[in-house]
């Protein structure tokens, strides 16, 4: 699931499940390599954990706030 700055608090801090946040950028090679792994983990842990992705180029407020 892709999220933005406005949805971050609700999707992450108010989630009833543990959340893994993938902060990524389109220009980031390692991010592109990790994306399919995150997608597989999301399937494997469905119902037990939540996986969200945030494009840091499109959403700078949250990464700046948390030093990412």
Please give the residue ranges for each predicted region.
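Short active-site neighborhood of thiol/selenol oxidoreductases, capturing the structured segment around
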Residues: 15-26
């Amino acid at each position: 699931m892709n999220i933005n700055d406005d949805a971050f608090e609700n999707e992450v801090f108010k989630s009833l499940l543990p959340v893994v946040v993938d902060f990524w950028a389109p220009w980031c090679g390692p991010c592109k390599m990790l994306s399919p792994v995150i997608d597989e983990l999301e399937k494997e842990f469905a119902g037990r954990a939540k996986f969200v992705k945030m494009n840091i180029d499109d959403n700078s407020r949250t990464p700046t706030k948390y030093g990412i």
